[in-house]
């Protein structure tokens, strides 16, 4: 089970939002690269970056911070990024800069042809981000709820060749209410590609519950507010996940 720390970028700083509201941002660090180093030193095997300004603007807005993070840890672990990715040129620029994966969200839902082109051009590097509330997909920084069923879209995108799916239950994100395990498993069982859970992770119990369903295709979990607020000790949680998955050697 991959525990993936999230570094949400707003105006070059590492912040957390409450339910996607840009006006409800808590600044956790003015040095995102130092934050990235901290999580890697604590045992992170992948990082999840979000360009919040980019998500709302529809184009990259935190390039300097992203490049600083990649310079700091990009040679050590894979780094994925979402937010504002609306063109093949942007994807190419990010992958050339050292990102391992880019996450396409709103653009995938609104313009499936773009996602298809991206999967063809950058095979193995495209993750799709599906944000849903009550099984229905939301777009545009969660401001618009669509009529699309999340499972239908996930299956379609799997056919296009996406690497994996980051699934966010937007009713719970940033609220520390616990991961929506049932909805995550339901999605993972419906597709043959890995699903990464997101939204609402609150404590070690969530991690233990996710490890129990890993066999259904739940590959990892995005760790957001809980590891910043202290509700979850990241290093201890990754260690516990490894124990549960029998990945610890007898050493």
Swiss-Prot record:
InterPro entries noted in UniProt: Aldolase_TIM, His_biosynth, HisA_bact_arch, Isoase_HisA-like, Isoase_HisA-like_bact, RibuloseP-bd_barrel
Localization of this protein: Cytoplasm
Single GO biological process annotation from the record: L-tryptophan biosynthetic process
GO cellular component: cytoplasm
Keywords, comma-separated and alphabetical: Amino-acid biosynthesis, Cytoplasm, Histidine biosynthesis, Isomerase
Keyword Amino-acid biosynthesis appears in the UniProt entry: yes
Name of the molecule in the record: 1-(5-phosphoribosyl)-5-[(5-phosphoribosylamino)methylideneamino] imidazole-4-carboxamide isomerase
Gene encoding the protein: hisA
């Amino acid at each position: 089970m991959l525990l993936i720390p999230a570094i949400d970028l707003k105006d070059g700083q590492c912040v957390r939002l409450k339910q996607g509201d840009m006006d409800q941002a808590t600044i956790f660090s003015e040095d995102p690269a130092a934050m990235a180093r901290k999580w890697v030193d604590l045992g992170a095997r992948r990082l999840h970056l979000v360009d919040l300004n980019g998500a709302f603007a529809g184009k990259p807005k935190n390039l300097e911070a992203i490049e600083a993070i990649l310079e700091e840890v990009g040679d050590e672990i894979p780094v994925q990024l979402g937010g504002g990715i609306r063109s093949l040129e942007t994807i190419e620029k990010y992958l050339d800069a050292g990102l391992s994966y880019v996450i396409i969200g709103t653009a995938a839902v609104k313009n499936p042809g773009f996602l298809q082109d991206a999967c063809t051009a950058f095979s193995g590097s495209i993750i799709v981000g599906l944000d849903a509330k009550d099984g229905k997909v939301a777009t545009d920084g969660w401001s618009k709820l669509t009529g699309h069923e999340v499972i239908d879209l996930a299956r379609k995108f799997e056919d296009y060749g996406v690497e994996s799916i980051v699934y966010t239950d937007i009713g719970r994100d940033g609220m520390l209410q616990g991961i929506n395990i049932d909805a995550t498993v339901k999605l993972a069982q419906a597709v043959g590609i890995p699903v990464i859970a997101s939204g609402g992770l609150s404590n070690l119990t969530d991690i233990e519950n996710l490890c129990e369903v890993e066999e259904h295709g739940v590959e990892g979990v995005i760790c957001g507010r809980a590891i910043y607020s202290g509700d979850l000790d990241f290093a201890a949680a990754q260690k516990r996940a490894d124990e549960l998955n029998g990945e610890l050697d007898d050493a």
